[in-house]
Amino acid sequence: MIVLLVVYVLYWTSVRADRAMDGEIDHLQDRWATGAVTAGAQPAPEPRRYEPGASFAIMYIPRFGADWAKPVLQGTAPGTLKKGLGHYSRTARLGATGNFAVAGHRRTYGDPFEDFPQLRPGDAVVLTDGTTWFTYRVVRRPYRTLPTDTGVIDPVPRASGFRRPGRYLTLTTCEPEWGHSHRLIAWAHLDATQSVTQGKPKALHS
């Protein structure tokens, strides 16, 4: 029974999660392609609300591989994180002033942040919401802290080195690799934006 449980945790949960993440990406791309989001359109006075548990963006991290792409969903509930990365609901919107903070599993459920410790200063974290590409740049190696250290996702995140308001990104995952006693944190700042009508950003061509 123990062997079967290990197989389920290590293999089957990841297979199901990979399918779920691919499905979320397909859903987003289909919605964007059919005009639910109009490329290059002027932003609405009231930005569209992120619906709990629903995907709204796709994240790319070249450091993790040319094919690495994960959906970003609203919220960090366990069921949400089985389908992709989760946006901390009390943090800023994508690209906005403040701190856009995102959580993801390091192991199990697709292992989206398995290679998190490999992040280095200058690495690109690229996201799109169907109209705009947002390129963030990592500012330091991953930082280890406790799960209770919620200051790391503040608008000006604690211990990040940032001293004033800006357009920031925080990524969080579990530490150690097969545990959850601590957290690994990566911070980035918004480096560039461009319309999807201009094609993919340089960071995805390097």
Task: Give the location of each predicted region.
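Short connector loops at helix/strand junctions that flank enzyme active sites
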Residues: G53-A54, D67, G95-T97, R120
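Extracytoplasmic/periplasmic soluble domains downstream of a signal peptide or transmembrane helix
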Residues: G98-F100, R106-S206
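N-terminal membrane-targeting segments
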Residues: M1-L28
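Short helix-to-loop capping/linker segments positioned immediately adjacent to catalytic or ligand/cofactor-binding
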Residues: Q42-R49, W68-A69, G110-E114, A124-V126
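Short beta-strand/loop turn elements enriched in aromatics
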Residues: A77-F100, F134-Y136
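Short, positionally conserved secondary-structure boundary motifs
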Residues: R48-S89
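Short extracytoplasmic
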Residues: Q29-I58
